[in-house]
Each structure stands twice: as C-alpha cells, then as structure tokens.
A protein has these predicted regions:
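Intrinsic low-complexity/disordered segments
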Residues: 1, 18-20
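Bacterial N-terminal signal peptides that target proteins for export
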Residues: 1-9
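A generic "folded-domain core" signal
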Residues: 22-197
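Bacterial N-terminal signal peptides
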Residues: 8-17
Length: 197
C-alpha cells in the first residue's frame, strides 16, 4: 500500500505545467489559491502543492525540443519524510522499447535498468521509489547527465539533462517537504524496495 501511495503522489505532482531552463535561482513565486509554490534554482524547479500529502513537494526539470516544442524528457524527484525515501518519475517520448527500460548516467554513476510503469498519449513513465544512494550519486556528479532510452530497432538515445543546481534544489525540496508533509498513518508498513545496481 505504501508503494501505491508513493507512486500516486509522485504521479499527482507531475500534473503541473512544464518549465523552461533558467540561469539563476529565484525567490519563491507567490502561489495563487490552489496553485503550487514555485522556486527556480538554476536548472531545477522546486514545487510545493497546497495539498495534505506525505510528500507535497518535488523538484522538476523538463526539457523540450526547441524546434517542435514537444517534451523530450521530464524528471521529477520527491521526498517522503515519513519513509526517509525518494520517489522518481521520468517521462520520455513514445516509441521506445518498453522491455529495455531506461538508465540514468552521469560521469560517475550509472543506474540499474529502470522499468517503465505506464504509457499514455504524452509518453512513457518510470515511476518508482529509489534509495538515497541514487540521489547522493546524482548530487555528487559533476557536469551533465543523461537518460538513456532504447528504441524498438535496438538503437539507444541519450537524452541530456542538467545537474546544475541539483544539490541546492534537492536540499530546498527536502526541507520544504519535511515542513509541509502530512504523514499517512499505516500500521507496520514497510518502505518499498529500491532497485539494486
């Protein structure tokens, strides 16, 4: 049940609109009634939604094709204070090889294969709980990173994303999640298992 709450909450966080890249951190935007509080930190956007949730905040990076203006890759990372765990949602375009999953790669880290959970008309999604070691590896990497997807024809495609501001955005998101989270009480619920490298 904890896994369903975790996945449901992260999926809900991804319903907000896309963002563009920015160069400098910005003060939180004043939130209109029912709208998320937004704070730009380099290439990441920290969002907190005005909902009673075990994880009302996430950090997001969405990259669009400049020519077609279609989303190429979106990454959302949320933190669940009551579980001391993270959840990740990665959205990629359709026409990928579902069985091959995807990987996240940096200069010092390569994730295990992450399996897709679902697809809709907007793309395919990896949605899962991850261990803190994956987040720490992303935070300690220098330079850029990429999501590596595979097509049905066997070709792989690296979709680049930025780690600029990752650590600062992560720390800000975790602090806000701890301050705003409304724990869900569950008797003896174990945290979802994270993939092993």
């Amino acid at each position: 049940m904890t896994k369903h709450i975790l996945i449901g909450a992260i999926a809900g966080l991804m319903l907000a609109c896309g963002v563009a890249q920015a160069q400098e951190a910005a003060a939180p935007a004043p939130a209109a009634a029912g709208q998320p509080e937004l704070k730009r930190i380099d290439d990441w956007l920290v969002r907190c939604f005005p909902v009673a949730s075990p994880s009302p905040c996430d950090m997001l990076q969405e990259l669009d094709d400049q020519r077609t203006r279609q989303r190429v890759v979106a990454l959302s990372i949320a933190f669940y204070p009551s579980l001391n765990r993270h959840a990740v949602q990665i959205s990629v375009p359709l026409e990928i090889s579902i069985p091959k999953g995807l990987k996240i790669q940096t200069d010092t880290y390569t994730s295990p294969v992450l399996k897709y959970r679902r697809c809709d008309r907007n793309g395919c999604y990896v949605e899962l709980a991850v261990d803190n070691a994956m987040i720490e590896a992303l935070a300690s990497s220098s330079g850029g990173a990429k999501v590596i997807i595979a097509a049905d024809n066997g070709k792989t495609y690296p979709l680049a994303f930025s780690l600029k501001g990752f650590s600062t955005a992560h720390d800000d998101m975790v602090a806000k999640a701890k301050a705003k989270a409304k724990p869900v009480s569950q008797p003896d619920a174990a945290a979802p298992a994270a993939p092993t490298p």
